Amino acid sequence: MKNCDKITDIVRSTTKNQRNPIIRIIRVQAMELKYEQITHKIIGASFEVHNFLGNGFQEVIYQRALAYELTQAGLSFEREIEQHIYYKNLPHPIGKRRADFVVEHKVLVELKATIQLEDVHLAQALNYLKVYKLDVGLLINFGSKSLTFKRLIRSIT
């Protein structure tokens, strides 16, 4: 990863019992995001889908439209690859799951079509990153009036 100059952000926050805001200075080390070009194209394709279809459709409609847009963007992908889930030393899987997309064999994409993303959606996508052994993912929600997304990074523990 390439390091850039340090950036200073000023964050103002208040608590219920305070009248004056607390000003904190946060130094952020700006750096190139892993697979930034791929995720940028995926997000752009997602905006194209949302701008055309809007919200209110079932998730599968957005999956099909996004598959078309990813192809138009020149990205290779696989849809709903089945992945087995193992527990400890058990020799057989205890279950299986399918992520919506794996793009360029590097970025997991999980779609939702709900009014707002919930913690359970985030937990699901993070678990998929672990199961698929991928470092970067996008959780994209088409269900609200504006497209929303979260960029996910698998923590290595």
Task: Label the predicted regions.
Residues 1-37, 121-122, 136-157:
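Domain-level recognition of nuclease-like catalytic cores that cleave nucleotide substrates
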Residues 33-43, 47, 88-99:
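Accessory recognition modules or surfaces
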Residues 35-40, 44, 55-59, 63, ...:
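Nuclease catalytic cores
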Residues 51:
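Electrostatic, structured charged patches in enzyme active sites and in nucleic-acid/phosphate-binding
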Residues 58, 63-106, 114-117, 139, ...:
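Active-site metal-binding core of divalent-cation-utilizing nuclease and nuclease-like domains
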Residues 111:
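Conserved SAM-binding loop
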Residues 129-135:
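Arginine/glycine-rich "motif VI" loop of SF2 helicases in the C-terminal RecA-like domain
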